A protein has these predicted regions:
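Substrate-recognition element of Asp-dependent hydrolases with the DxDx(T/V) motif
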Residues: 47-71, 80-81, 117
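Mg2+-dependent phosphoryl-transfer enzymes with acidic/Ser/Thr/Gly-rich catalytic loops
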Residues: 33-40, 74, 79-80, 87-162
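A positional/architectural concept
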Residues: 22-52
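Short, basic/glycine-rich phosphate-binding loops at helix/coil junctions
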Residues: 23-30, 67-75
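Non-catalytic pre-domain segments flanking phosphatase-related domains
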Residues: 1-18
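Short coil/turn segments at beta-strand junctions that form active-site/ligand-binding loops
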Residues: 10-12, 55, 102-103
Length: 162
């Protein structure tokens, strides 16, 4: 990861997909149609480390799901969900923050993240990312989605910037 240190030190905005990054990309549905997903609590502690080094973060999800909003609220993370064009949201938020794309990190796991992964300075995927997007990544995390990959990323940014 030594070659990533300069990129990690430059991160001024971190953007995360939700399903497959904060979750293991599975969903449980009960007989009433209510959905449940599994999270890693360590990911929330990782976001606190981004707070410590003043790196803002955002969750962007294509799913218009109350579970996404509820988890984002608990994590005190800004969240935009129900989005068809993630890249447009990324462009808007980077412009609002005055952050160049080369100083943005994006963590995503699937083909609907490809445009964002291809646009930023530090494209990152979980260990279990869909094979089609792995070549777009500058960094393939060792942890899978929903099992500490957000924490792994946040810890590395924190270490590079503290």
């Amino acid at each position: 990861m030594t070659d990533l240190a300069p990129l990690l030190a430059r991160v001024r905005l971190a953007v995360f997909d939700f399903d497959g990054v904060f979750t293991d990309n599975r969903v449980w549905v009960n007989e009433h149609g209510e959905e449940s997903v599994r999270f890693s609590r360590s990911d929330g502690l990782g976001l606190r480390r981004l707070d410590e080094v003043d790196v803002p973060y955002l969750i962007v999800s294509t799913e218009p799901n109350p579970v996404v909003q509820a988890r984002a609220a608990k994590l005190r993370a800004e969240c935009v969900n129900g989005v068809d064009d993630k890249l447009a949201v990324l462009e808007e938020r980077a412009a609002e923050a005055g952050v160049a794309f080369e100083d943005v990190a994006y963590v995503g796991n699937d083909v609907n993240d490809a445009a964002c992964l291809g646009a930023v300075g530090l494209p990152v995927v979980p260990a279990d990312a869909w094979p089609e997007v792995v070549p777009l990544a500058r960094w393939v995390l060792t942890r899978p989605g929903g099992d500490g990959c957000v924490r792994e990323f946040c810890d590395a940014v924190w270490e590079a910037q503290r």
